Curated annotation (Swiss-Prot):
Family the UniProt entry places it in: Belongs to the CTP synthase family.
Protein residues bound to UTP: 13, 186-191, 222
Name of the protein this chain belongs to: CTP synthase
Organism from which the protein derives: Mesorhizobium japonicum (strain LMG 29417 / CECT 9101 / MAFF 303099) (Mesorhizobium loti (strain MAFF 303099))
Gene giving rise to this polypeptide: pyrG
GO molecular function, one term: glutaminase activity
EC number: 6.3.4.2
Chain segments carrying region Amidoligase domain: 1-265
Length: 542
C-alpha cells in the first residue's frame, strides 16, 4: 500500500513547494522507491488551459492531453515519470464533477455540501490509481490561511485519520526572513503559520524552512519547541545557485531520511545520488558558453517558458556548456532592425504563442536566421512563422499569413477543422469554445529517411506532445519544398505537417509540437542537445 506525503506552504506564496515535492520524489526514487506526485490547485478554473501566461505561467501538457500546472513539469523533470490527467486537479474541476453528478441525481436528493461531498471528491482524487507506487506526494497549492485552500486542507486532515497508522506524513514549507536591521533570522512567521495549520487540525511532522543563509542551531531548537516538531525534523532549505542543486542540498540536510523515519522505515535503502552529482558538476564546471536568443511575446514573465528554459539548460548539460539566454520581445523587430540584436548570438529560438501581436517580429527573426546561417529552432508558432517567411521571401507568396490573424487570401497557416485522435475524428469550428479545443497531448509523426531531424532522433517514427489549433496548410507544401524548405515530418495520415527544415542550412528546424515538455536533466531531448551543439559550432564562427 502506498504511503502519502502532504506538502503545504505557509507565510508567503512562491516558496517552491513544487520544486520541494519534485526533489523529494527524486530522492525517494534514488533509494529505489516508486514515487508519484500530484498537484491540488485551489483556483476555480477547470484547468489552466485558457489562463493568461502572465497570470499563470506555462501550461504543461501531458501525454494524455491534460492541460496542467507548470509544477507537473518539475515533477516530470526531476523524477522522469510522465504525468497524466490524474496528477492534477483544481477546485473548478471538482465543483464541475459534483454539479454534474448532482444534476444526474447521483446524490439521491441529499443536500450537497463542502463537507462531505467536496472533501470526498478531493480524497478520491488523492487515493485513486496509486497501486503501483510506494509513495504518493501531494502538493497543496496556495498558502495556509487562504480561504480557497480550506477544503483541500480539511480533506488531507481527514486522510490522516482514514489511512492506516504511520501512512501519512505532513511536510510544511515556510519562510524564515532575515531582518537586516536586527541582524537575525526571525522564527515568528513560521510559528504563526504552523499555528494556523494546527488550528485546522494538521500537525506538521517536518518543517522545511526556506532561508537565504544558514539557520543557527538555536533558532532550529526554537522552531522545534514552539512548533512541536522534532529538532531533527526542522530542515533548512537554503537558496542554491541552480534548481538541479536542490536534490543534493535536501539530501545533505536529511530531508529524505527524516521523511522515511517519520514513516518508521528503518533501516532505509541507501540512495544512488551519482546521477544528480554529475548534473551538478556539469552545471558548475562548464567547458564553454553559448548565447541563445529567445524571440517571444511573453518575455516579461519567464515562467511562461519554464519548460523551454529547462530544456535549453539540458541541451547545455549534454554539451558541457553554459547556455546564456537573451530575451527579446518580438515586437521590437517590427520597429527596429533585428541585426544589432541577433548578430552576436549563437542560436535563435522562436517559441510557441498565440495571436497576431509580435508575429511579424518572429517572421523577421526566422528570416535573419535563414539568411545569416544562424541555428534556428522554431517551436509550434515558431515553425508556422518560419513557413510564412519562406512563402513570402522564397515562394513569392506576398500576402502569406495565418487565419489566426484574420481573413487572408493566402492562408499558409490555417485552423485545423479535423484530425484523428486514436480512432476518433475530432472536429472544431472557428467560433467554438477555447477551453479544451486544441490538438492536445502525444501524437505520432513519421520522419523522412535521410532528413536531418530523423538523424537527430535516430528514428523515423516519433511521438511528441502538441498544443495548437492552427497548422501549416498542406496545400503550400509543394511550393515551399520547391524553394528548399523540406517537410521532413508528417502525421501518419500524411495530412498534418509536423516538422520542416532547410537541408542546406547548418541547423534550421521547425516543429509543430513541443519537445521541451519531454526533456529531462538526466535525459536531455535530442533536439535541444543537437540545437545547442550547433550553437557551439556557431560560437566558433562569430
Amino acid at each position: 500500500m502506498a504511503r502519502y506525503v502532504f506538502i503545504t506552504g505557509g507565510v508567503v506564496s512562491s516558496l517552491g513547494k513544487g520544486i520541494a515535492a519534485a526533489a523529494l520524489g527524486a530522492l525517494l526514487q534514488a533509494r529505489g522507491y516508486r514515487a508519484r506526485i500530484k498537484k491540488l490547485d485551489p483556483y476555480l478554473n477547470v484547468d489552466p488551459g485558457t489562463m493568461s501566461p502572465y497570470q499563470h505561467g506555462e501550461v504543461f501538457v501531458t501525454d494524455d492531453g491534460a492541460e496542467t500546472d507548470l509544477d507537473l513539469g518539475h515533477y516530470e523533470r526531476f523524477t522522469g515519470r510522465s504525468a497524466n490527467q490524474q496528477d492534477n486537479i483544481t477546485t473548478g474541476r471538482i465543483y464541475k464533477n459534483i454539479i454534474e453528478r448532482e444534476r444526474r441525481g447521483d446524490y439521491l436528493g441529499a443536500t450537497v455540501q463542502v463537507i462531505p461531498h467536496v472533501t470526498d471528491e478531493i480524497k478520491n482524487f488523492v487515493l485513486n490509481g496509486n497501486d503501483d507506487y510506494d509513495f504518493v506526494l501531494c502538493e497543496i497549492g496556495g498558502t495556509v490561511g487562504d480561504i480557497e485552500a480550506m477544503p483541500f486542507l480539511e480533506a488531507i486532515r481527514q486522510l490522516g485519520n482514514d489511512l492506516p497508522r504511520n501512512n501519512a506524513v505532513y511536510v510544511h514549507l515556510t519562510l524564515m526572513p532575515y531582518i537586516p536591521t536586527a541582524g537575525e533570522l526571525k522564527t515568528k512567521p513560521t510559528q504563526h503559520s504552523v499555528k494556523e495549520l494546527r488550528g485546522i487540525g494538521i500537525a506538521p511532522d517536518i518543517l522545511l524552512v526556506r532561508a537565504d543563509r544558514a539557520i543557527p542551531k538555536e533558532e532550529r531548537r526554537k522552531l522545534s519547541l514552539f512548533c512541536n516538531v522534532r529538532e531533527s525534523a526542522v530542515i533548512q532549505a537554503l537558496d542554491v545557485p541552480h534548481i538541479y542543486d536542490v536534490p543534493m542540498a535536501y539530501h545533505k540536510e536529511g530531508l529524505d531520511s527524516e521523511v522515511l523515519a517519520a514513516f518508521g522505515i528503518d533501516p532505509a535503502p541507501k540512495p544512488r545520488m551519482e546521477p544528480w552529482q554529475k548534473v551538478s558538476d556539469r552545471i558548475h564546471s562548464p567547458e564553454g558558453e553559448v548565447t541563445i536568443a529567445i524571440v517571444g511575446k511573453y518575455t516579461g514573465l519567464k515562467d511562461a517558458y519554464k519548460s523551454l528554459i529547462e530544456a535549453l539548460s539540458h541541451g547545455g548539460l549534454a554539451n558541457h556548456v553554459k547556455v546564456k539566454l537573451d530575451w527579446i520581445e518580438s515586437e521590437i523587430f517590427e520597429k527596429e532592425d533585428p541585426t544589432p540584436w541577433l548578430e552576436k548570438v549563437h542560436g535563435i529560438l522562436v517559441p510557441g504563442g498565440f495571436g497576431e501581436r509580435g508575429s511579424e517580429g518572429k517572421i523577421l527573426a526566422a528570416k535573419f536566421a535563414r539568411e545569416r546561417k544562424v541555428p534556428y529552432f522554431g517551436i509550434c508558432f515558431g515553425m508556422q512563422m518560419a513557413c510564412i517567411e519562406a512563402a513570402r521571401s522564397l515562394a513569392g507568396v506576398e500576402h502569406a499569413s495565418s487565419t489566426e490573424f484574420g481573413p487572408t487570401e493566402e492562408p499558409v497557416v490555417g485552423l485545423m477543422t479535423e484530425w484523428l485522435k486514436g480512432n476518433m475524428l475530432e472536429k472544431r469550428r472557428e467560433t467554438g469554445d477555447l477551453g479544451g479545443t486544441m490538438r492536445l497531448g502525444a501524437y505520432q509523426a513519421d520522419l523522412a529517411k535521410g532528413s536531418k531531424i530523423a538523424e537527430i532522433y535516430g528514428d523515423t517514427q516519433i511521438s511528441e506532445r502538441h498544443r495548437h489549433r492552427y497548422e501549416v496548410n498542406i496545400d503550400y507544401k509543394e511550393r515551399l519544398e520547391d524553394c528548399g524548405l523540406v517537410f521532413a515530418g508528417m502525421s501518419p495520415d500524411g495530412v498534418l505537417p509536423e516538422t520542416v527544415e532547410y537541408p542546406d542550412h547548418p541547423w534550421f528546424i521547425g516543429v509543430q509540437y513541443h519537445p521541451e515538455l519531454k526533456s529531462r536533466p538526466l535525459d536531455p531531448h535530442p533536439l535541444f542537445a543537437s540545437f545547442i551543439e550547433a550553437a557551439v559550432e556557431q560560437s566558433r564562427l562569430v
